[in-house]
């Protein structure tokens, strides 16, 4: 570490890093989209952002124990290449699962297509698209936590014992397809133009890297709007009362509105992972959710200590809700 965590310089860097990296990434995406080879240059910007974040993970880590190798780096990269690479190939050839579904459904809903405000400035269209897509992403994420038929695929993402920039894209491809479908089909049906999808993809890519990074970032009021590292660490907690919260992909607007926002005034959890067991190899991880034995291994059995933690967390959450209700009544 170059500077002490108690120094003013450290505090300033920690507070500015999240917005600075996001703005830098989106600025790079702007120039990439204006080029003739926008996917190539976008990937250059994306990988450069990964390198910068990886550097800060060494300089100012949130959790030092997460710097130790866990034997999953190859699997993390392989899943990223399969899911994110597949999405980029689909974008390059102009076809994807949600687009195919929308193409079939749009004739019956053609009166919806002119609802999209394409006369608005692109920045406002992107913000609108983010909010609409976020609802689908939120629901896909929440359903994946609340239903075992979907959790068996999503558990792969939560199976790691550390968060760092390289396991950002650690998703089962079925999980990814489900999220993309719920997030993008509504936009296709509404007639959103291609640039809106490109910009939503860029925002999602860079916020995803930041959300999963092991960097000590002080995000403060940004936690009320965006999905930040602090909020996402709570989401990866082994304790269900903490883990089944903060489902937002980019924004936490739907968490705020639907009662799943969680940000208690204490350091976010570092006890992350799942109570079940995920296979070791890349191909085995892809196949595991499809077998009965694999599903049982993924679900696992909760240890007594974890059950006690969950009960305590649930009681604390109930106490906070009651206290807030009393304050509102007295006001």
Swiss-Prot record:
Function of the protein: Involved in the biosynthesis of ornithine lipids (OLs), which are phosphorus-free membrane lipids. Is responsible for the hydroxylation of OL within the ornithine moiety.
The protein, known as: Ornithine lipid hydroxylase OlsE
Residue ranges of coiled coil: none
Organism: Rhizobium tropici
Reported consequences of knocking out the gene: Mutation affects the membrane lipid composition, particularly ornithine lipids. Mutant is deficient in OL hydroxylation.
Pathway given in the UniProt record: Lipid metabolism
Alphabetical keyword list: Cell inner membrane, Cell membrane, Lipid biosynthesis, Lipid metabolism, Membrane, Oxidoreductase, Transmembrane, Transmembrane helix
EC number: 1.-.-.-
GO terms under cellular component: plasma membrane
Membrane-spanning segments: 13-33, 37-57, 85-105, 120-140, 189-209
Sequence similarity: Belongs to the sterol desaturase family.
Main enzyme class: oxidoreductase
Domain Fatty acid hydroxylase: 126-260
Bilayer topology: Multi-pass membrane protein
Location(s), subcellular: Cell inner membrane
